[in-house]
């Protein structure tokens, strides 16, 4: 396994529309394992392949259990996802490994139902609500070249751009 480099905003790579996965082989399995290791090392709960430079329609989500621990057996590997149903609306404070240090409220569907494939190309259906539904939507957005900051109001977007400039200034002075 290997730690992969996470691509940060404003890299144009994050705007790439990811392609369908067609080869469910050992290479894909290794990529998924490396993504998981990278996500855990970065203290994230979700990671889309494009965030590590792989323009493939795959993502992983590993929510912590009540004890706060993320168990690998709980990791969802979602490949070639498609929304079947969506419903409700909720606001959720989101962050992103590609936009480190910035968190903001984003409106999302409260419930989603998706069809996807696992690492063995088996078709699965998943119904999700609350945090899992939010994470699924956030990561699928990445597959379409969309970041959570794109969903902010103009006012919140300006706040984000200002904070980003401040952060970049601080990093230059280090």
UniProtKB/Swiss-Prot annotation:
Its cofactor is Fe(2+). This is Peptide deformylase. Binds 1 Fe(2+) ion. It comes from Helicobacter pylori (strain HPAG1). The active site is at 139. Removes the formyl group from the N-terminal Met of newly synthesized proteins. Requires at least a dipeptide for an efficient rate of reaction. N-terminal L-methionine is a prerequisite for activity but the enzyme has broad specificity at other positions. It catalyses: N-terminal N-formyl-L-methionyl-[peptide] + H2O = N-terminal L-methionyl-[peptide] + formate. One of its GO terms (molecular function) is peptide deformylase activity. HAMAP family: Pep_deformylase. It is an enzyme of class 3 (hydrolase). Belongs to the polypeptide deformylase family. NCBIfam families: pept_deformyl, PRK00150.1-3. Pfam families: Pep_deformylase (PF01327). Its EC number is 3.5.1.88. Gene3D superfamilies: Peptide deformylase (3.90.45.10). Keywords: Hydrolase, Iron, Metal-binding, Protein biosynthesis. Fe cation binds at residues 96, 138, 142. One of its GO terms (biological process) is co-translational protein modification. InterPro entries: Peptide_deformylase, Peptide_deformylase_sf.
């Amino acid at each position: 396994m290997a730690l992969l480099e996470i691509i940060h905003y404003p890299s144009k790579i994050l705007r790439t529309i990811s392609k369908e996965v067609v080869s469910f082989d050992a290479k894909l399995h290794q990529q998924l394992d490396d993504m998981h290791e990278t996500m855990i090392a970065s203290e994230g709960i979700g990671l889309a392949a494009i965030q590590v430079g792989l323009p493939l329609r795959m993502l992983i989500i590993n929510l912590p259990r009540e004890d706060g621990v993320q168990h690998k057996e709980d990791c969802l590997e979602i490949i070639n996802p498609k929304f079947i149903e969506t419903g409700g609306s909720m606001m959720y404070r989101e962050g992103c490994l590609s936009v480190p240090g910035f968190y903001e409220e984003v409106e999302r569907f409260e419930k989603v139902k998706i069809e996807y494939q696992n690492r063995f190309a088996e078709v699965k259906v998943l119904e999700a609500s609350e945090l899992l539904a939010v994470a699924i939507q956030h990561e699928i957005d990445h597959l379409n070249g969309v970041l959570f900051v794109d969903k902010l109001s103009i006012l919140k977007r300006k706040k984000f751009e200002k904070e980003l400039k401040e952060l970049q200034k601080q990093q230059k002075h280090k």
